[in-house]
Regions:
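Glycine-rich beta-strand-centered segment in the early N-terminal region that forms part
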Residues: 2-48
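Short, well-ordered loop/turn sites that connect or cap secondary structure elements
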Residues: 35-36, 93, 188
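Short glycine-centered segments of the SAM/dcSAM-binding site in methyltransferase folds
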Residues: 41, 98, 122, 192-193, ...
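A glycine-rich, Thr/Ser-enriched phosphate-binding loop motif common to dinucleotide/cofactor-binding enzymes
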Residues: 64-90, 95, 101-105, 150-151, ...
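N-terminal Rossmann-fold NAD(P) dinucleotide-binding loop
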Residues: 109-110
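Adenosine-nucleotide cofactor-binding segment
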Residues: 117-183, 240
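Glycine-rich phosphate-binding loop and adjacent beta-alpha segment
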Residues: 179-262, 295
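C-terminal capping/lid region of NAD(P)-dependent oxidoreductase domains
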Residues: 259-268, 276-295
Protein backbone atom coordinates (compact mmCIF):
# COMPACT_ATOMS: atom_id res chain seq x y z
CA UNK A 1 0.00 0.00 0.00
CA UNK A 2 2.82 2.37 0.90
CA UNK A 3 6.52 2.21 0.09
CA UNK A 4 7.84 -0.13 2.80
CA UNK A 5 10.45 2.30 4.13
CA UNK A 6 7.81 4.99 4.67
CA UNK A 7 5.69 2.58 6.71
CA UNK A 8 8.64 1.53 8.83
CA UNK A 9 9.49 5.18 9.46
CA UNK A 10 5.99 5.59 10.90
CA UNK A 11 6.25 2.46 12.99
CA UNK A 12 3.53 0.79 10.93
CA UNK A 13 5.43 -1.84 8.98
CA UNK A 14 4.99 -5.61 9.36
CA UNK A 15 7.96 -7.97 9.16
CA UNK A 16 7.74 -10.88 6.74
CA UNK A 17 7.28 -13.33 9.62
CA UNK A 18 5.29 -10.96 11.81
CA UNK A 19 1.65 -10.80 12.86
CA UNK A 20 -0.49 -8.38 10.90
CA UNK A 21 -0.89 -5.27 13.04
CA UNK A 22 -4.24 -4.09 14.30
CA UNK A 23 -6.16 -3.22 17.41
CA UNK A 24 -8.42 -5.81 19.02
CA UNK A 25 -10.84 -6.11 21.90
CA UNK A 26 -11.24 -9.19 24.02
CA UNK A 27 -11.59 -10.67 27.49
CA UNK A 28 -8.71 -11.24 29.91
CA UNK A 29 -8.12 -14.97 30.53
CA UNK A 30 -4.91 -14.59 32.58
CA UNK A 31 -3.27 -11.62 34.25
CA UNK A 32 -0.17 -10.82 36.28
CA UNK A 33 -1.19 -7.17 36.65
CA UNK A 34 -3.17 -5.76 39.54
CA UNK A 35 -4.83 -3.40 37.05
CA UNK A 36 -6.66 -6.18 35.22
CA UNK A 37 -8.68 -9.14 36.44
CA UNK A 38 -9.78 -12.27 34.65
CA UNK A 39 -12.98 -11.45 32.80
CA UNK A 40 -12.18 -7.79 32.20
CA UNK A 41 -12.78 -6.50 28.68
CA UNK A 42 -9.79 -4.72 27.20
CA UNK A 43 -8.58 -3.12 23.99
CA UNK A 44 -4.98 -3.53 22.90
CA UNK A 45 -2.55 -3.93 19.98
CA UNK A 46 -2.96 -7.70 19.63
CA UNK A 47 -2.97 -7.83 15.83
CA UNK A 48 -4.69 -10.42 13.68
CA UNK A 49 -4.76 -13.27 16.20
CA UNK A 50 -7.21 -15.21 18.33
CA UNK A 51 -5.10 -14.75 21.48
CA UNK A 52 -2.53 -12.22 22.55
CA UNK A 53 -0.22 -11.19 25.37
CA UNK A 54 0.40 -7.53 26.05
CA UNK A 55 2.06 -5.35 28.73
CA UNK A 56 -0.53 -3.79 31.01
CA UNK A 57 0.37 -0.16 30.13
CA UNK A 58 -0.62 -0.85 26.51
CA UNK A 59 -4.14 -1.98 27.42
CA UNK A 60 -7.31 0.00 28.00
CA UNK A 61 -10.07 -1.42 30.20
CA UNK A 62 -13.51 -1.18 28.63
CA UNK A 63 -16.91 -0.55 30.20
CA UNK A 64 -19.52 -2.46 28.22
CA UNK A 65 -22.28 -0.54 30.01
CA UNK A 66 -21.30 2.69 28.20
CA UNK A 67 -21.26 1.24 24.70
CA UNK A 68 -20.60 -2.10 22.97
CA UNK A 69 -16.97 -3.12 23.41
CA UNK A 70 -16.54 -3.08 19.63
CA UNK A 71 -16.79 0.71 19.72
CA UNK A 72 -13.29 0.79 21.24
CA UNK A 73 -12.10 0.00 17.71
CA UNK A 74 -14.25 2.62 16.05
CA UNK A 75 -16.21 5.58 17.34
CA UNK A 76 -14.58 5.39 20.80
CA UNK A 77 -11.20 4.27 19.52
CA UNK A 78 -8.47 5.41 17.18
CA UNK A 79 -10.77 6.24 14.21
CA UNK A 80 -13.11 8.35 16.31
CA UNK A 81 -10.16 10.03 18.00
CA UNK A 82 -8.67 10.77 14.58
CA UNK A 83 -11.84 12.51 13.43
CA UNK A 84 -12.20 14.42 16.70
CA UNK A 85 -8.60 15.63 16.76
CA UNK A 86 -8.45 16.59 13.10
CA UNK A 87 -11.73 18.48 13.23
CA UNK A 88 -11.39 20.21 16.60
CA UNK A 89 -7.67 20.97 16.66
CA UNK A 90 -6.78 21.41 12.98
CA UNK A 91 -10.13 22.30 11.42
CA UNK A 92 -10.68 25.13 13.93
CA UNK A 93 -14.43 25.20 13.17
CA UNK A 94 -16.65 28.25 13.41
CA UNK A 95 -20.44 28.21 13.48
CA UNK A 96 -22.02 28.84 10.09
CA UNK A 97 -19.07 27.51 8.07
CA UNK A 98 -19.23 24.74 5.48
CA UNK A 99 -17.33 21.49 5.87
CA UNK A 100 -16.74 18.81 3.25
CA UNK A 101 -15.48 15.34 4.15
CA UNK A 102 -14.86 12.40 1.85
CA UNK A 103 -15.32 8.78 2.96
CA UNK A 104 -18.21 10.29 4.87
CA UNK A 105 -19.67 7.02 6.17
CA UNK A 106 -16.40 5.62 7.52
CA UNK A 107 -15.62 5.86 11.24
CA UNK A 108 -13.43 8.94 10.75
CA UNK A 109 -15.59 10.80 8.24
CA UNK A 110 -18.84 10.11 10.09
CA UNK A 111 -17.32 11.44 13.32
CA UNK A 112 -16.18 14.60 11.53
CA UNK A 113 -19.59 15.17 9.96
CA UNK A 114 -21.49 14.71 13.22
CA UNK A 115 -19.15 16.99 15.13
CA UNK A 116 -19.55 19.61 12.42
CA UNK A 117 -23.33 19.45 12.65
CA UNK A 118 -23.23 19.70 16.44
CA UNK A 119 -20.97 22.76 16.16
CA UNK A 120 -23.36 24.57 13.83
CA UNK A 121 -21.61 23.95 10.51
CA UNK A 122 -23.07 22.70 7.22
CA UNK A 123 -21.75 19.18 6.68
CA UNK A 124 -21.46 17.94 3.10
CA UNK A 125 -20.31 14.37 2.58
CA UNK A 126 -18.72 12.57 -0.34
CA UNK A 127 -18.98 8.79 -0.55
CA UNK A 128 -18.81 5.95 -3.04
CA UNK A 129 -22.26 4.78 -4.04
CA UNK A 130 -25.89 5.76 -3.58
CA UNK A 131 -26.34 3.48 -0.55
CA UNK A 132 -23.45 5.09 1.29
CA UNK A 133 -24.79 8.55 0.50
CA UNK A 134 -28.18 7.54 1.89
CA UNK A 135 -26.46 6.29 5.05
CA UNK A 136 -24.57 9.57 5.38
CA UNK A 137 -27.77 11.60 5.23
CA UNK A 138 -30.24 9.36 7.03
CA UNK A 139 -28.01 7.88 9.74
CA UNK A 140 -25.27 10.45 10.27
CA UNK A 141 -27.19 13.65 9.50
CA UNK A 142 -25.22 15.17 6.62
CA UNK A 143 -27.13 17.88 4.74
CA UNK A 144 -26.09 16.40 1.43
CA UNK A 145 -23.83 13.63 0.17
CA UNK A 146 -22.37 13.33 -3.31
CA UNK A 147 -21.64 9.95 -4.89
CA UNK A 148 -18.19 10.43 -6.40
CA UNK A 149 -18.58 7.30 -8.53
CA UNK A 150 -21.35 9.06 -10.47
CA UNK A 151 -18.92 11.65 -11.85
CA UNK A 152 -16.42 10.79 -14.58
CA UNK A 153 -14.06 13.69 -13.87
CA UNK A 154 -13.07 16.01 -11.05
CA UNK A 155 -14.59 18.85 -13.06
CA UNK A 156 -18.00 17.15 -13.06
CA UNK A 157 -17.77 16.46 -9.34
CA UNK A 158 -16.71 20.06 -8.72
CA UNK A 159 -19.81 21.39 -10.47
CA UNK A 160 -22.08 19.31 -8.24
CA UNK A 161 -20.08 20.24 -5.16
CA UNK A 162 -20.29 23.93 -6.03
CA UNK A 163 -24.08 23.62 -6.11
CA UNK A 164 -24.05 21.90 -2.70
CA UNK A 165 -21.67 24.53 -1.27
CA UNK A 166 -22.90 27.90 -2.63
CA UNK A 167 -20.80 29.78 -0.07
CA UNK A 168 -17.65 27.80 -0.76
CA UNK A 169 -15.81 25.37 1.50
CA UNK A 170 -14.17 26.43 4.76
CA UNK A 171 -12.93 23.04 5.98
CA UNK A 172 -12.07 20.07 3.81
CA UNK A 173 -11.21 16.98 5.85
CA UNK A 174 -8.95 14.97 3.54
CA UNK A 175 -9.30 11.20 3.59
CA UNK A 176 -9.00 10.18 -0.06
CA UNK A 177 -7.12 12.68 -2.31
CA UNK A 178 -7.30 12.03 -6.06
CA UNK A 179 -10.35 13.22 -7.96
CA UNK A 180 -12.08 14.49 -4.83
CA UNK A 181 -9.14 16.69 -3.80
CA UNK A 182 -8.95 18.17 -7.29
CA UNK A 183 -12.68 18.90 -7.17
CA UNK A 184 -12.61 20.59 -3.76
CA UNK A 185 -9.50 22.76 -3.96
CA UNK A 186 -10.86 25.47 -6.29
CA UNK A 187 -13.90 25.83 -4.01
CA UNK A 188 -11.91 26.49 -0.84
CA UNK A 189 -12.56 29.86 0.77
CA UNK A 190 -9.76 32.22 1.73
CA UNK A 191 -8.35 31.12 5.06
CA UNK A 192 -9.71 27.60 4.65
CA UNK A 193 -8.32 24.64 6.59
CA UNK A 194 -7.47 21.17 5.28
CA UNK A 195 -6.57 18.51 7.87
CA UNK A 196 -4.95 15.62 5.98
CA UNK A 197 -5.81 12.27 7.52
CA UNK A 198 -5.44 9.89 4.57
CA UNK A 199 -4.85 9.59 0.82
CA UNK A 200 -6.53 6.27 0.17
CA UNK A 201 -7.25 6.73 -3.54
CA UNK A 202 -3.50 7.03 -4.16
CA UNK A 203 -2.37 4.10 -2.02
CA UNK A 204 -2.76 1.46 -4.74
CA UNK A 205 -2.00 3.71 -7.71
CA UNK A 206 1.72 4.23 -7.22
CA UNK A 207 1.31 7.98 -6.79
CA UNK A 208 2.88 7.83 -3.32
CA UNK A 209 5.84 5.87 -4.60
CA UNK A 210 7.08 8.65 -6.84
CA UNK A 211 4.95 7.94 -9.91
CA UNK A 212 2.18 10.46 -10.57
CA UNK A 213 -1.07 8.87 -11.69
CA UNK A 214 -4.18 10.14 -13.43
CA UNK A 215 -2.97 13.66 -14.07
CA UNK A 216 -2.04 14.35 -10.44
CA UNK A 217 1.34 15.73 -11.49
CA UNK A 218 -0.20 17.95 -14.17
CA UNK A 219 -2.59 19.47 -11.63
CA UNK A 220 0.05 20.08 -8.97
CA UNK A 221 0.78 23.71 -9.99
CA UNK A 222 -2.93 24.54 -9.77
CA UNK A 223 -3.17 22.95 -6.33
CA UNK A 224 -0.20 24.91 -5.06
CA UNK A 225 -1.61 28.10 -6.52
CA UNK A 226 -4.85 27.54 -4.62
CA UNK A 227 -2.88 27.06 -1.41
CA UNK A 228 -1.05 30.34 -1.98
CA UNK A 229 -3.87 32.54 -3.23
CA UNK A 230 -6.47 31.22 -0.77
CA UNK A 231 -4.01 31.36 2.18
CA UNK A 232 -4.95 27.81 3.07
CA UNK A 233 -3.77 26.03 6.20
CA UNK A 234 -2.95 22.41 5.37
CA UNK A 235 -1.94 20.10 8.20
CA UNK A 236 -0.96 16.48 7.80
CA UNK A 237 -1.18 14.51 11.01
CA UNK A 238 -0.47 11.04 12.38
CA UNK A 239 -2.86 10.41 15.24
CA UNK A 240 -0.35 8.35 17.24
CA UNK A 241 1.54 11.61 17.85
CA UNK A 242 -1.37 12.89 19.92
CA UNK A 243 -2.28 10.10 22.38
CA UNK A 244 -1.86 12.55 25.26
CA UNK A 245 -5.26 13.95 24.26
CA UNK A 246 -7.06 10.60 24.08
CA UNK A 247 -8.57 10.90 27.56
CA UNK A 248 -9.92 14.35 26.65
CA UNK A 249 -11.49 12.81 23.55
CA UNK A 250 -13.15 10.05 25.57
CA UNK A 251 -14.42 12.51 28.17
CA UNK A 252 -16.07 14.53 25.40
CA UNK A 253 -17.36 11.78 23.11
CA UNK A 254 -18.20 8.75 25.30
CA UNK A 255 -21.19 10.44 27.02
CA UNK A 256 -22.46 11.62 23.63
CA UNK A 257 -22.25 8.10 22.22
CA UNK A 258 -24.05 6.71 25.28
CA UNK A 259 -26.78 9.34 24.84
CA UNK A 260 -27.17 8.56 21.13
CA UNK A 261 -25.96 12.01 20.11
CA UNK A 262 -22.99 10.56 18.21
CA UNK A 263 -23.96 7.56 16.10
CA UNK A 264 -21.87 4.77 14.60
CA UNK A 265 -22.23 2.00 12.06
CA UNK A 266 -20.30 -1.27 12.01
CA UNK A 267 -19.62 -3.68 9.14
CA UNK A 268 -18.81 -7.02 10.79
CA UNK A 269 -17.13 -9.93 9.00
CA UNK A 270 -17.12 -13.32 10.73
CA UNK A 271 -13.88 -15.30 11.00
CA UNK A 272 -10.21 -14.35 11.09
CA UNK A 273 -9.68 -16.30 7.86
CA UNK A 274 -11.84 -13.69 6.09
CA UNK A 275 -9.80 -10.72 7.32
CA UNK A 276 -7.66 -10.37 4.15
CA UNK A 277 -10.78 -10.27 1.98
CA UNK A 278 -12.35 -7.69 4.30
CA UNK A 279 -9.21 -5.53 4.11
CA UNK A 280 -9.24 -5.69 0.32
CA UNK A 281 -12.91 -4.71 0.36
CA UNK A 282 -12.13 -1.79 2.65
CA UNK A 283 -9.50 -0.47 0.26
CA UNK A 284 -11.94 -0.88 -2.62
CA UNK A 285 -14.66 1.02 -0.75
CA UNK A 286 -16.96 -1.97 -0.26
CA UNK A 287 -17.40 -1.62 3.50
CA UNK A 288 -20.17 0.31 5.25
CA UNK A 289 -19.00 2.07 8.38
CA UNK A 290 -16.26 0.62 10.58
CA UNK A 291 -14.91 -2.67 9.22
CA UNK A 292 -14.53 -5.24 12.00
CA UNK A 293 -13.58 -8.91 12.18
CA UNK A 294 -15.43 -11.03 14.76
CA UNK A 295 -13.77 -14.21 16.03
Amino acid sequence: LHPTKNLLDLGLGVADDGTMVGGAVGRVIASRSAAFEIGDYVMGPFGWASHGCCPAPHLRKLDKNIAPISTALGVLGMPGFTGWYGFEKLGRPRRGETLVVAAATGPVGSMVGQLAKAAGLRAIGIAGGAKKCALAIEHFGFEQCLDHTAFATSKDLRAALKSACPNGVDIYFENVAGKVLEAVMPLMNTGGRIPICGLISWYDEGALGGHAVGGAQDNLPKLWRSILVKRLSINGFIISDHWALFDSFLADIAPRVAAGEIRFYEDITEGLENAPKALTGLLNGQNFGKQLIKL
